[in-house]
Amino acid sequence: MNNRIDIDFEHKYKYHEGSGTLNILFQSSSIGSDYDYNKITFVAKNNNSLKKIKIKTRLFFQVGSGTKWAEESKLSLAGANKEEMMSSKFTRADGIVNSDNFDYDFTTNNFHSPGGLNLRGYSGYLAPEFNEDGTIKSFDYNGTSGAALNTEIDFTYYLPYVLRNNKIKSYLFADAGIITSKNITVENFKNAFSDLRADAGIGFTYTLDNFGPLETINPFVIRFDMPFFLNRAPATDEDFLQMRWLIGINKAF
C-alpha cells in the first residue's frame, strides 16, 4: 500500500502586468505504507501580458529522498506520473485515451498528459543516459528529484478573427529540465542530475464548452502541440529539428 501524508500550501499574488500562484507540496510515506520516500515540490506559475501577447511561465523544482519509492509516485520527465493519471477521468482507464499511449519506448509517442517536469516533446520516451563507452547508464523518463522551466507565448490576438471566434488559441512553447533518481547530498548535487533536455515548438488549443442538454459538464480543452525541436532527440529521429506532433487533453499548465 502507498499510504502517504500530503501537505499543500498555496499562495496567490499579483504584480504589475501579471499575476501568479506559488504551490509548496510536502509528501511523505506514512504508517502502514509498503514504501519509504518523501519529497517536497515547489511550483510557481506566472501570467504576464506584453501588449496583446500573453506570456505564461511555470517554474518547477522537486527534491525527493527515500530507500523504496512507489513507481507511480515518481517524478515524470515528460508529464503526469501514473498517480496523477489515475486522478484524471480521461486517463484513469481505457476510453477516450487508449492506455497504449502511456507506454515508454526508445522513441517518443503522440499523447501528452500534463504534469511533472512537463517536457512535452519527450512524451513516451525512455530518455536513456549513456556512459562514455556507449552503454546505457540509466533511463531518465522518471526520477525522484528534478527542475524545469516551461514557457508559453500566446499570440492568439494575431490570428484571423474566424479562428479566434471559434475558440482556437495558439502559442509558441519551450520546455527545459533536468532529472535524477539519486538521493541529493551536498557532495553529489553538482553531478547527480542528467544533462539538460529541452524542446520547443508551436501549439494550438480548442475549447469544448457546448454540450447541449449536458450543461453540467465542465468545459475541457483539446490541445495539439508540435515540438519541432528536441535538443537530445531519440536515435530513431532523423534530426534535432523535424516534424513531430502530439495530442493532449487540457492545457499543459
What name fits each language-model region?
Residues 135-143, 184-196, 236:
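Short, contiguous acidic/charged loop-to-helix segments that flank catalytic cores in large enzymes
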Residues 159-169, 180-184, 212-217:
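Extended hydrophobic-aromatic, low-complexity segments
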